[in-house]
Every structure is written in C-alpha cells, then in structure tokens.
Regions:
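Histidine-centered divalent metal-coordination motifs
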Residues: 223, 262, 270
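Bacterial N-terminal signal peptides that target proteins for export
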Residues: 3-13
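Boundary at the C-terminal end of the N-terminal hydrophobic targeting segment
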Residues: 25-29
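Catalytic phosphate/nucleotide-handling subdomain of diverse soluble enzymes
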Residues: 275-277
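Hydrophobic alpha-helical bundle signature of multipass membrane enzymes
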Residues: 31-259, 280-286, 290, 299-302
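Bacterial N-terminal signal peptides
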Residues: 14-23
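Extracytoplasmic/periplasmic copper-protein system
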Residues: 294
Length: 304
C-alpha cells in the first residue's frame, strides 16, 4: 500500500510538472510569429527541486555511472583554450546539488522528459534540431574558414528580437566582446562537465530516443549556459528587454530537455551559474573597458 501511495504521489507531481509546460506563447524573436512551439513555465524547476535528490539504497551500480572520459570529443583541444576575461576558479561558483542517478528527483526528471518525448510534435522536434546547431565555436577563429562569419552570426541569434540593426556587420565591438565572453563561458562549461561527469539522461533511461549521442557529459548544459550568459550581457545593454532576453535563453534550455539530451536540473544550474559568471566578468578591468566601448557602439547604432 505504501508503495502504491508513493507511485500515486509521483504520478500527480509529474502531471503537475507536465501541465506547467503545456502553455503556448510567442517566443522572443520567433520567426514568422510561430506560436506552435510550447514554451516552458520556469515553475517546473521549482517543483522538481522539492523532490529528494539523494541516492536510493541498493542502487550503487547506477549511482556509480559517470560520463566516460574516453568518450569526450576533442578534449585535448578544449583543455588548451585559455580565457580572455574570466579568472575565477569553478569552486567560486554557487554549490548546486547534482541529483543522484537513483534519486527520486532524477526519476521525476526522466518521467518529465519521457512525457515531453511522447507529446512533442514533428514541428517542435525540427525546431529543437535547428537551434541545436546555433552555437559559437571558439575554435573557429580563422577568417578564411567558410563558416567563420556564420559562427559569429550565431552570437546574435539570441538577441534577434532587438531588431535588424542588431547584427554582426553593424556591431564590430559587440561581436568581439560576445565572441570573447562566450569563448570564456565555453572554457568554464568544459571544466564543469569534467568535474561532475554526469551521464546523459538517455544513458540512465534507455526509453529516451535521441538523434545521436553527444561527446561530453550532461551537467551543466552548454547550450543553456552560453545562452544565459549571452542574455545576461545583453540585458545589461538593454535592461528594458531583460525578460524577453531571458525567455529567449530559456528557449535554448528547454529545447535540450525536449530533445532528451539534458535534464531540467542541467538547465537550471546553467541559468544560476551564468548569472554568477557575468557578475564575475564585471570584476575584470579589461572586460569593463570593452563593455563600455560596446555601450558607446550601441548608443551610436541602436535606433532611438
């Protein structure tokens, strides 16, 4: 009877979490005003955090599961990258509990993702796969590379709702600042992932069907972390658009959950750490000088 009661409570909580994301809204800068892509309520993170994240007895093998170092893609190249601005050790960031693989919280997260997988439309899947390719590659620094300009254009995708003036060709100072900031955030993202070595959701729950396995650990989400960092920078340049920009970053985060490649807790940690990361940047004198130059550029280029 006790087990049945627990299952019922888990079912009800899972249902509440699913209902919290079954809203439809217009995304910031969503091309063609497409309103058919569900947007999440951030309250589903709060609900999941209420669930016990500690390991359950008798699951030592499951809890020992880590992302294998041998499966890391390009790790040697990643480790060679040095930061432009960021200097804080990752231990300076807020402690965030990574739920154990066997925990009730991880089970609730996996159930949530299975329900997303069951209910996602072909249109939503196509949208997720599209924006999965919109990221900045810090190793693509050769201007003769055919994808060099596209790589830098990707830095501007999150803020596309600011208007047509917000573009690489129009904002060289902004392009340089964002490329350096996201470069730094990628360096930190790798360090976080190596430290926690969290296995991907599909490694714990084989019913999650993915397009292809990814070459690094789950925690935190790189797409989410970089998007929230980008949003935090832009929100300091356009504070009146902060809510829109954070919603745009949330699109990236939720798309990773919808694809089954990241836990919600990966996304939430990314949001928290991104805010701290940007706060730390403002302690760097060179960053502040470069940021002030970008503010002047915006004052000249942004329509009044």
């Amino acid at each position: 009877m006790k087990n049945e009661t627990y299952k019922f409570k888990r079912y009800i909580l899972g249902l509440l979490i699913i209902l919290s994301v079954m809203t439809v809204s217009k995304a910031f800068g969503n091309e063609n005003g497409n309103t058919n892509i569900r947007q999440p309520e951030t309250s589903h993170y709060e609900k999941l955090l209420q669930i016990d994240g500690k390991p359950q007895p008798g699951n030592e093998t499951l809890d020992a599961l880590k992302f294998p170092l041998s499966e890391w893609g390009g790790l040697y190249s990643w480790k060679l990258l040095k930061t432009y601005y960021a200097t804080k050790p990752i231990d300076a960031f807020q402690k965030y509990e990574v739920p154990a693989n066997s925990s009730k919280r991880t089970r609730a997260e996996l159930d949530y993702m299975l329900e997303l997988q069951r209910t996602r439309s072909a249109e939503e899947l196509a949208w997720c796969l599209k924006i999965a390719d919109i990221y900045y590659d810090p190793m693509n620094i050769n201007p003769t590379n055919p994808k060099y300009n596209q790589n830098r254009d990707n830095l501007f995708y999150l803020g596309r709702g600011l208007g047509s003036w917000y573009a690489r060709e129009n904002l060289p100072q902004t392009t340089e600042l964002l490329s350096r900031v996201v470069h730094d955030s990628m360096v930190y993202m790798v360090e976080f992932k190596l430290k926690y070595a969290r296995p991907r959701p599909y490694a714990v729950e084989p019913r999650l069907k993915i397009e292809k396995p990814l070459p690094h650990g789950s925690f935190p989400s790189g797409h989410s972390f970089n998007s929230y960092v980008n949003a935090e920078i832009l929100a300091r340049l356009a504070p009146e658009r902060r809510a829109d920009l954070m919603n745009a970053a949330q699109e990236f985060a939720w798309s990773r959950e919808l694809l089954g490649v990241h836990y919600p807790s990966d996304s939430e940690a990314s949001r928290i750490w991104a805010a701290q990361f940007v706060k730390f940047l403002f302690e760097n004198k060179q960053f502040v000088r470069d940021f002030e130059a970008v503010k002047k550029e915006w004052a000249q280029k942004r329509p009044k």
